[in-house]
C-alpha cells in the first residue's frame, strides 16, 4: 500500500499566497454588499458609546502617507472598541474651504475675475466634492471601516448653519470683536493668517544697526547722544514711531571717538565687537525706566521717535533698544497703544509700500530693504550692515515669507476665557503626556485669535453694518442667517443684498433710512473645523460631545486641537474631548522629510497596489507612531515577511483542523496533557498582553506579541513537535484531538486579535474556521483570557523545560555541523542535567523524544557525571549520537522496531499499529 496516503497531512483551501492587491478589493466589495458598517453598529447597539471624532483632512489631492498613518491608527482603535463591549461609530469628515482650493482652480485656468464671487464659489464647491470622492475611495482601499455614505463635510449647509451658531454664541458672550491690530499677513495670499497657518523656514535677511539721534533728553540725557537699534526688517523703518527700552535694565552712554551712543550695559562687549569700536568708554549709566519719554529723531523723516518702556525687550540679541513700529508687530502695537501712538501701516494688501512711506512708495516690501538701507547710509545713520540666515515665518500654503501688518480684522478674544481653557487642558488625558504641556503653553501664551480672512471660499462672517458703521450681531440676525444657510448654503450671502439676508422688517437705530451692508470677510478655516464638536458631535444622534478621543498629527496642537478647544470652551465651558492622542510625521528610510525635490515620496496607493492594504496597516502597527516614523522599500519588505509568517501560521492551523468538529472532537481542558495546557497558558498570556496593548494604544506591542507568538511559541515549538502526532497518529487518537483542541482555540483567538490590524486577512480566514456561524469576524468580540487553575505551576515547569530545550537545540546544531547527524530525527540524545532540571524532566509524562524531535532520548546521570567530551550548556550536558536502527518509511523516525510486523516491513511498530487500526480493512 502507499503509506503516504495514510498520513493526515494538512488540508485547506485557504491560499498560501496573500495576493492582497487583488483579493482585498473583492473583500471590500463583500463588506459593502453586506453593509458591514451598519451591521457592526446594529450588533453593538445599546452598548456604551465610544466616540473617536475624525479630524477632517483637507479635500485636495491624493492621500499621502500621513493621511494613511492617521486613518489606520483611528481604524485600529474603532475596530478594537467595537469588539470589546462598546458601540464605536466612526463618522469621517472633510475640511473643504480655504485657499488651496481657490489656487487649484486658478491653476486649472479658471478666470475668477470674469465671474461673480457666487459663481466662483460654486466651482470651488464642485472641486471640493470631487476631491472628497477621490480621497474617500482611497481611504476605503486602506480597509478603514466608517460611515462612508454619511460623512460630515464642512461646506454642507447643515454644517455651516451650526458654525454660524457657534460664532453667534461667542459673539453673544462678548468674545468676538473687530479691531485694528498687527496680524500675520501673507502678501502672496493677500489675506490674514492664523498661527496655525504659519511654518518656519530659513530666510536670508539684512541685519542692520541704526542710529537715532536724541532730540529731547528730558534732563536725563544731554541731547548729543544717539540710540542704537538693531533690525532684520529695514522695510519697517518708515513705520517707526518709537524706541522701546526695558525698565529694569541698565543702559550705558558709550563714548566712541566724538560720538555718544546708548545701548544696554550688558550688551556693551557684543555691540562693541560687532560695530568694531576702538577705545570705547562708558561715560554714564542710567536705568531704563529713567529714559521713558525721552525723544529721538527718526533717521530720515522729520518725525519724533518716542522712547517707551516695554517688558518685551530682551538682551538675547541686538542692543537693548528696540525699533518700535505699532503697525508691524504685536509687542510694538501693545506698547504703542499704551503710549497713545497711532497705528501706522504704510504697506498694502499686496505687500507694497504706500504713500505713507514717502520715497519708497510702490516698492514691494522686500525690494524696499536695499533703498532704505542706502538712505540710512546717505544720512549717516547706518552703523553696520551684514546678512544673516534665520528662521522666519512663511505662509504654509504659498511657502513665501509673511509680514506683520496692522489691519482691521475680526478677533476671538482668548483672554476672556483663557483660565477656562487652561482648566480644560488639565482635565484632558494626553497621549503622549507631553501633549498637555505643549497645549498648555500655547494657550497660555497665545494672543487673541484673528478669525477673519480676505478671501472668497469660506463661511462668511455673519455681521451686518448699520449706516453709521455699527456692526450688528444679534440673536435674531444670527438665527436668521443660520436658517438661510441651512436652507440654501452659505452662497446665499454672496447672491443676495444685505437687506434680503436680514429678517423681514428688521430695523436698527444706526440705520434711520433702513440701509445696511454686509461683511465681506470669511472665517478662518480653523473656525470651520474647530466647530465640528457642535456641527457633528452634538448634532448627530449616533455621536456625543465630548468625544472620547481626538487623534491627529502633532502639528494639530496649534491647529485642530487648539481651535476645537477654543470654540468648545467658549460655547460650552468644557473641552470637546476627554482624551487626545497625537502621532508623528512619516519620513523616508533615512529619516528625511519627504519631498518632490529629493524624490523620496512614498505613496499609499503604490504600496497597496504592490503589496496590499494589510501590509501597509501592519507597518503602521509596527512603528512607534508617537514619534516620527520611517518607511522605505526595505522596511516594507521586512513587514511583508512578518505578514507571510502570520499568514502561514493561519494556513497551518486551518490545514490541521480540516477534520476537526468543535462540537464533537473537543477535549476537555482537564483531560489535556500538560504541554497542551501550557500552550493554552501561553495563549491566555497573549490575549491579556494584546488586549492591554490595544487599551493603551500601544500597537507596536500588539505587533511584536503576535509575531513572537507565531514564530517562537507556535512555529518553533508547539507546531513543530505536534506534526509527529497530527500527521502520524490515527484521526481520533487522543493526543491528536487534544492538540487540535488547542490549535482551534489558538486559531479563533488569533483571528480575532489581528482583526483590528489585518481586517482583510482576518475576514478571509474566518469562514474557513470549523463551526463559526458569524458572517464576519467583525461581528464577534475579542477573546477572553481563561485562567487555568494550575497556570503558574505549568509556567514555572514548562518555561524551565523551554530553556533546557534551547540547550538541546544548540547541541543538535553542533552535531549537525560536525556531520554526526543529518537532521534531528537521526539523533539519539543523552542528557546530564542539573539536579533541578533532572527532577523536572522526570516529572514529564509526555514523550520527550517527541518534544525534542529526536528518535531516541535517554536521561543519564547528573551534569558532573557527563563524559568529559560531552558539550556542557547552562542547564545540561548533551551527548548526541546517531540513533540505532533503520528509518521508518512513514514517520521518518529511526527505530530498532522496523520490520517487526511482517505485513509492514518498512514501518516502525507504532506506524504498523496505526495503519492496521485505521487503514487496513
From Swiss-Prot:
It is found in: Cytoplasm. Its EC number is 6.1.1.5. Belongs to the class-I aminoacyl-tRNA synthetase family. IleS type 1 subfamily. L-isoleucyl-5'-AMP binds at residue 552. ATP binds at residue 596. Zn(2+) binds at residues 888, 891, 908, 911. InterPro entries: aa-tRNA-synth_I_CS (IPR001412), aa-tRNA-synth_Ia (IPR002300), Anticodon_Ile_BEm (IPR033708), Ile-tRNA-ligase (IPR002301), Ile-tRNA-ligase_type1 (IPR023585), Ile-tRNA_ligase (IPR050081), M/V/L/I-tRNA-synth_anticd-bd (IPR013155), Rossmann-like_a/b/a_fold (IPR014729). It comes from Bacillus cereus (strain AH820). It catalyses: tRNA(Ile) + L-isoleucine + ATP = L-isoleucyl-tRNA(Ile) + AMP + diphosphate. This is Isoleucine--tRNA ligase.
